[in-house]
């Protein structure tokens, strides 16, 4: 996208030091990355880190320093405040270039046992055998997210610039296993079929635009294809790799660590013999070429003409060595 003139912004309202986020977003090519430290400032960040398990204390700090901001829901930055910050950056963008933002929210993150005065539970699971407090808290948090997302869509509905928004969940919440067992119709999660085990980790995604796009309902699609689908929907020039993934998704719409599903809905475990072995082997080699075989990477496949990828950093080389070592241990 940078080769096509886009400026890029990343927002994750949590600590930047975790998982080396600053280095990661820089290596991914983002022009700017905003984390919790940038929102709070250094002194308040230290206070937050020291009292992270006490949402009422944190709310008091926010009330003193950011009165009326609605910054927190429980102990995390709310989706409403997050979206306001996203809109603020959009409004202050370089208007001479197209704009791309990648935003990982924090509002609904676990755990789900701590009470907070700034959170009101409003949604409850029905038709279940007992009360599940964690599930109810998470369901109520989703309602807050729905309201915040509605506000974001309403804002960009009134923006003249053509805009595409993709919203997706990165993982399922850590709630009561009994609740999950009930809604999946099994006595114990250890009794799940491979297909049920895979469906347990499904999350929804939604693509919206403030102009007419082709409406469609996609039954299943694994996350390795999602970025290519968004680029295609937005009319952005695709790399050969993006095109390859979109074609692969028509054959195997789901590929994940549990197995894969073909276009007819047939499920395969990785240990199964299937008619797709050669296709998957080819995919693995292409992935390896892109991620690890940097000296021989096919630039015409993975990048738009005119873009030069960043050189490998020392940390990347160390990470590759560690991965190889881990694989040797696993194979031993």
List each language-model region with its residue ranges.
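Solvent-exposed soluble domains appended to multi-pass membrane proteins
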Residues: 1-332
């Amino acid at each position: 996208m940078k080769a096509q003139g886009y400026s890029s912004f990343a927002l994750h309202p949590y600590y930047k030091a975790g998982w080396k986020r600053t280095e990661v977003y820089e290596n991914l090519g983002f022009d700017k990355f905003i984390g919790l430290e940038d929102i709070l400032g250094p002194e308040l960040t230290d206070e937050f880190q020291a009292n992270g398990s006490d949402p009422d204390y944190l709310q008091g700090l926010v009330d003193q320093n950011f009165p009326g901001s609605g910054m927190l829901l429980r102990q995390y930055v709310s989706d409403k405040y997050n979206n306001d910050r996203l809109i603020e950056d959009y409004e202050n963008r370089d208007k001479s270039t197209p704009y791309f933002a990648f935003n990982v929210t924090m509002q609904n993150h676990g755990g789900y046992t701590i009470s907070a005065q700034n959170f009101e539970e409003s949604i409850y699971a029905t038709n279940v055998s007992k009360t599940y407090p964690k599930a109810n808290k998470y369901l109520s948090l989703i309602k807050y997210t729905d309201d915040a997302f509605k506000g974001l869509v309403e804002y960009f509905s009134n923006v003249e610039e053509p805009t595409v928004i993709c919203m997706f969940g990165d993982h399922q919440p850590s709630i009561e296993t009994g609740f999950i067992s009930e809604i999946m119709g099994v006595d114990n999660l250890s009794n799940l079929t491979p297909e049920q085990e895979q469906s347990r980790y499904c999350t929804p995604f939604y693509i919206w635009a403030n102009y007419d796009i082709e409406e469609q309902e996609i039954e299943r699609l694994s996350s390795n294809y999602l970025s290519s689908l968004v680029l295609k929907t937005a009319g952005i020039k695709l790399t050969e790799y993006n095109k390859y993934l979109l074609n692969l998704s028509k054959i195997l719409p789901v590929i994940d660590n549990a197995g894969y599903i073909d276009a007819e809905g047939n499920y395969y475990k990785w240990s199964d013999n299937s008619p797709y072995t050669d296709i998957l082997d080819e995919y693995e080699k292409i992935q390896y070429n892109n991620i690890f075989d940097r000296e021989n990477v096919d630039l015409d496949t993975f990048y738009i003409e005119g873009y030069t990828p960043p050189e490998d950093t020392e940390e990347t080389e160390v990470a590759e060595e560690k991965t190889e070592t881990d694989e040797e241990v696993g194979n031993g």
